[in-house]
Amino acid sequence: QAASLPLALRGQDLIAQASTGSGKTAAFGLALLARLNPRRFAVQALVLCPTRELADQVATEVRRLARAEENIKVVTLCGGVPLRGQIASLEHGAHIVVGTPGRVMDHLERGSLTLEALNTLVLDEADRMLDMGFFDDIARLAGACPPIRQTLLFSATYPEGIARLAARFLRKP
């Protein structure tokens, strides 16, 4: 956390090997909040997580970190929850979206989510997302983001798939 935060705050792309419970959510949460414009009601940060449980934990932590700021809206998009409520939440304006690749992809395809204002993409537990077969969804989501953005990749392990992801989506990590 201490090593990644200064780089992340400078807007650099980052690959960090971090296990669960290492404080990485605080590190990337502070970094994405630093880049956020609360007066712009558009999705400016997207955090992809492998599971609904992790997405819920991350969203809770980011909301806690955002309490110091005025009116920052965090929306969680995961499967197993009705789409209708999620669409309504997005229509009311969201600054940060935390979710699983499949459900975030659903919203992108439906047009209920747009990413053109995005400045930070976080891949949390990227190795687990690859193990679960999400490479194509991650690739499509990253392709829908503006090319000029910060990408932060966190992974407990560093398999070949992570190297491929990093080579494709990160700039000078």
At which residue positions do the language-model features occur?
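Residues at the beta-strand->loop junction immediately N-terminal to the Walker
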Residues: 15-18, 48-49, 155
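Short glycine-rich anion-binding loops that position phosphate/pyrophosphate groups of nucleotides
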Residues: 21-22, 102-104, 127-128
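Post-DEXD/H (motif II) to motif III coupling segment of the RecA-like Helicase ATP-binding lobe
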Residues: 114-123, 127-173
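Conserved pre-motif I regulatory segment
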Residues: 1-17
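Motif I (Walker A/P-loop) of helicase-class P-loop NTPases
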Residues: 5, 24-34, 59
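Conserved nucleic-acid-binding Ia/Ib motif block in the N-terminal RecA-like helicase ATPase lobe
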Residues: 40-109, 117-120, 163-167
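Walker A/P-loop
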Residues: 12-30
